[in-house]
């Protein structure tokens, strides 16, 4: 399983990669392996500001549906359109082409509430 060092992680198994004032958000390799085959990603919050820890969407696998929680407060700027036709990208490349949303980070200090790769791996 992969745990990239350049990301921050939530206890709910989301990751965030910050690039300036924006960030990409997805689910971890562990989360996708636990969920199994991803069949649909639903993010109804495009254009909305969602608080840290709040639900911004859901992810549906063959066997279950799980909420997606915001790692930091941010405005949802973009949803990964490739997931409409290929939701399995979340399984195949969770930290790359399988990203779920791009956000405008509202409070970078909230990143301090998240785990680094080592701390996240220790929770599994």
Task: Pin down the residues of each PLM region.
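Short connector loops at helix/strand junctions that flank enzyme active sites
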Residues: 63, 69-71, 95-98
């Amino acid at each position: 399983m992969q745990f990239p060092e350049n990301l921050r992680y939530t206890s709910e198994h989301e990751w965030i990669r910050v690039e300036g004032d924006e960030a990409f958000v997805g689910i971890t390799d562990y989360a996708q392996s636990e969920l199994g085959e991803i069949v649909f990603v639903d993010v109804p919050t495009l254009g909305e500001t969602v608080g840290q820890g709040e639900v911004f969407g859901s992810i549906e696998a063959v066997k279950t549906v799980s909420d997606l929680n915001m790692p930091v407060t941010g405005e949802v700027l973009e949803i990964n359109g490739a997931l409409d036709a290929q939701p399995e990208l979340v399984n195949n490349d969770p930290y790359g082409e399988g990203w779920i949303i791009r956000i405008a980070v509202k409070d970078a200090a909230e990143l301090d509430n998240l785990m680094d790769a080592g701390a996240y791996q220790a929770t599994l």
